[in-house]
Amino acid sequence: MLMIKAINFMAKKHKGQTRRVSGLPYITHPTIVAHLIGKYKGDSKHLEELQITALLHDVIEDTDCDRFEIEREFGSMISSMVMELTNDTERIKEIGKPEYIKQKMVSMSKYAFILKLVYRL
C-alpha cells in the first residue's frame, strides 16, 4: 500500500515535468529506477523502502517538496535515503562538483549508494 502511495505522490509532485532529452514524462525515470532496484535487489530485506526511495529520489530537488513532507508521509528511513540522494546546490557552488560528489559518495549509506549507481545506468 505504501508503494501505491509513493507512486501517486511522485506523479503528483512531478506533474507536467518532462525529461530533457527525450521529452517523456519525468516520472518514467524514477519508475524505471524502482523497477531496476526490484530486478537487482529483489532479495533485499528493505526492497520496498529502496523502491519507494527510487520513486521519490528527485522530489526534493525538482519540486516544492521538502524532507519533512517525505518523512511525514513515508518515514525516516526513506526520508534519510532521499536526502542522501539530493544534491546540495549551495555546497556544490562552495566546493565544486567533483569534490562534492567525492564527499557525498564516501559518506553515503550502502542503500543510497546502490540507488545512485542504479539511477546512473
Model regions and ranges:
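Active-site helical microenvironments for divalent-metal-assisted chemistry
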Residues: 1-121
